């Protein structure tokens, strides 16, 4: 019979890995609460139309990377490839525009993209993302970037750079796109096959290509900064002022773009300093037109997202110490059926008093139970045997200093509390 394994591009998160995941998730939530963000959870799947309208019909995400199927009613459904469009859909559906603006939300959830699996990149991956909807002021951009920076720094990832750019708005971007098309049309012979395809449907993405020949071309490509309207120039200038005010070490990168059509004005990424431009930990930007594209009123917004798997990869690479997960305080070993019943009762009593306890629940030898206790990392072992039952006592062993003593059964709670 063929062995069934996890699908390509996915990974089981085993107990031995959970300390990293708990560490990152908890710190993400704690950071969000410091900045006044509230958690939101949206469905794993949405109607496909949401991503076609929101992410962009011509994007590679929609064209090549989505997991899409018809459900039994014939509705086209897609496993979410990213978190921003679903949050914006929820913002509209639940009338959040009536709340004090900006509405500040965060999520920690899986996303699905059919991509070539590689180190730190999976077809199902976990994202931590934040969205601030309902404010155009560049100080909000600065706050989001500051929040992401403090998050990475707090985790221990200190050797990072912040890349920053403005890709303009609906008024000024068309002239920039035309300049890009004109420039690259003269150099199509040097473009990789993917960029030749992108030239007509998504010329911005040519600046983002990681192929060497395309990167060389990008160095001489037109700059978005030369095409910004006055409003976008002022917005970008103010943002840089606020980032300097917050002492954030940003670098302007004229080739920085994002892979989704909804981005406007500010775009940014965080990169490990030693790895170069192909290893972004996370990024984000403004999407001032997305709510309107989905049927709402014009509503400025900005967001940020980061892949948790990639964060953990960098934590391990930097050899950053992670707090261990809690282990049970007490292991209860026993000898005989009657002692087993007493062990069950005692374990229940300890748990009712918020003392974590485990027991073997099998017919292992005492030696095997002690090995299990040692492996579990418990601080104390309680042993119940025939003599202990007869005398209404237990044997208590401190696993740290190897001290052992006999105590009355009814003194256990007082001793452990």
Which positions does each model-derived feature cover?
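TRNA-recognition modules of translation machinery and tRNA-sensing kinases, especially anticodon-binding
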Residues: 1-372, 376-416
């Amino acid at each position: 019979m063929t062995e069934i394994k996890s699908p390509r591009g996915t990974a089981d998160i085993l107990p031995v890995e959970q300390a990293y995941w708990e560490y990152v998730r908890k710190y993400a939530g704690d950071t969000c609460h410091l900045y006044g963000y509230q958690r939101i959870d949206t469905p794993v799947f949405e109607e496909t139309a949401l991503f076609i309208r929101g992410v962009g019909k011509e994007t590679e995400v929609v064209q090549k990377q989505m997991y899409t199927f018809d459900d039994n009613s014939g509705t086209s459904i897609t496993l979410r490839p990213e978190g921003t469009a679903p949050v914006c859909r929820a913002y509209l559906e639940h009338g959040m525009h009536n709340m004090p603006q900006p509405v500040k939300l965060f999520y920690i959830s899986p996303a699905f993209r059919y991509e070539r699996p590689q180190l730190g990149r999976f077809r199902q991956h976990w994202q931590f993302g934040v969205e601030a909807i309902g404010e155009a002021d560049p100080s909000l951009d600065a706050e989001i970037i500051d929040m992401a920076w403090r998050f990475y720094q707090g985790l221990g990832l200190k050797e990072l750079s912040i890349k920053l750019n403005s890709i303009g708005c609906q008024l000024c971007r068309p002239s920039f796109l035309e300049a890009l098309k004109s420039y690259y049309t003269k150099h199509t012979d040097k473009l990789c096959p993917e960029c030749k395809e992108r030239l007509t449907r998504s010329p911005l993405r040519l600046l983002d290509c990681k192929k060497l020949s395309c990167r060389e071309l990008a160095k001489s490509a037109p700059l978005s900064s030369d095409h910004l309207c006055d409003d976008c120039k002022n917005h970008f200038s103010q943002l840089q002022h606020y980032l300097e005010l917050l002492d954030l070490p940003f670098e302007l990168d004229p080739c920085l773009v994002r892979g989704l059509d909804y981005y406007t004005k500010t775009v940014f990424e965080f990169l490990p300093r030693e790895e170069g431009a192909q290893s972004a930990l996370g990024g984000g930007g403004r999407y001032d037109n997305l709510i309107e594209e989905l049927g709402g009123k014009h509503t400025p917004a900005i967001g940020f997202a980061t892949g948790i798997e990639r964060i953990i990869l960098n934590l391990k690479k930097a050899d950053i110490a992670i707090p261990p997960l809690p282990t049970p305080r007490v292991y209860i070993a026993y000898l005989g059926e009657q002692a087993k019943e007493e062990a069950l009762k005692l374990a229940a009593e300890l748990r009712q008093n918020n003392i974590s306890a485990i027991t073997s629940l099998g017919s292992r030898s005492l030696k095997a139970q002690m090995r299990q206790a040692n492996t579990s990392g418990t601080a104390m072992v309680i042993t119940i045997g025939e003599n202990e039952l007869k005398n209404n006592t237990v044997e208590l062993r401190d696993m740290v200093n190897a001290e052992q003593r006999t105590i009355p059964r009814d003194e256990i709670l007082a001793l452990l509390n």
